[in-house]
């Protein structure tokens, strides 16, 4: 490793719990929610989710997710199937999760693509839209001096602000699994865990052991 201090960032952590609750009609549980997310990048697990009063939201999430998958086709069917099979929700989108495991995209079982509403051309479609959006933003930036900016939920600027101002901020970061941050994943693997940021830098938090089925899924990608 180089002497440069680095941390891996992804926005799937901060865009996990709130959209999940809204998809399931649980908008009233968003304010004050508490969560624990850990695993590996693009395969982090929502291990615990509670409302502002400390009530476990998973029993209701599991019930509603099963009902929604049985009742209609929607954009998150793969991850809701994860909830049914593994008991937990995954941070990364359903279209990507279908690519990260051997269960859904099978040449011998093409009917699974339709059953789980998997968009095989999602990434090229997203790239086309991004390029169009960038061109639009360039035109707006070059022709207007009065544009306003709304800060996104991406971590980078908030990390810099917190270190400079000696504040405290929590992120989900990707770091080497030193000190058994996740006990049942390899010590030299890169894991995604909660991290506290302050004036002294970034401090990964120990999670302990993942449920065995979740660790096994992570290992298919670590391997």
Show which residues each predicted segment covers.
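Long, compositionally biased stretches enriched for glycine and/or charged residues
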Residues: 3-5, 12-223
């Amino acid at each position: 490793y180089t002497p440069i201090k680095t941390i891996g960032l992804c926005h799937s952590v901060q865009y996990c719990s709130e959209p999940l609750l809204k998809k399931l009609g649980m908008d009233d549980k968003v304010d004050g929610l508490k969560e624990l997310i850990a695993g590996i990048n693009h395969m982090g697990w929502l291990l615990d989710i509670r409302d502002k009063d400390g009530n476990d939201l998973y029993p209701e999430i599991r019930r509603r997710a099963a009902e929604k998958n049985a009742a209609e086709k929607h954009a998150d069917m793969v991850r809701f199937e994860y909830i049914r099979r593994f008991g937990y929700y995954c941070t990364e989108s359903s279209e990507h999760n279908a690519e990260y495991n051997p269960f859904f995209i099978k040449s011998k079982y093409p009917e699974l693509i339709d059953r789980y509403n998997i968009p095989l051309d999602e990434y090229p479609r997203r790239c086309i839209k991004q390029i169009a959006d960038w061109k639009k933003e360039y035109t707006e930036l070059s022709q207007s001096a009065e544009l306003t900016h709304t800060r996104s939920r991406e971590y980078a600027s908030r990390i810099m602000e917190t270190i400079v101002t000696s504040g405290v901020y929590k992120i989900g970061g990707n770091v080497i699994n030193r000190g058994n941050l996740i006990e049942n994943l390899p010590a030299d693997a890169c894991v995604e865990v909660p991290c506290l940021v302050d004036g002294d830098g970034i401090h990964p938090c120990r999670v302990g052991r993942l449920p065995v089925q979740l660790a096994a899924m992570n290992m298919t990608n670590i391997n």
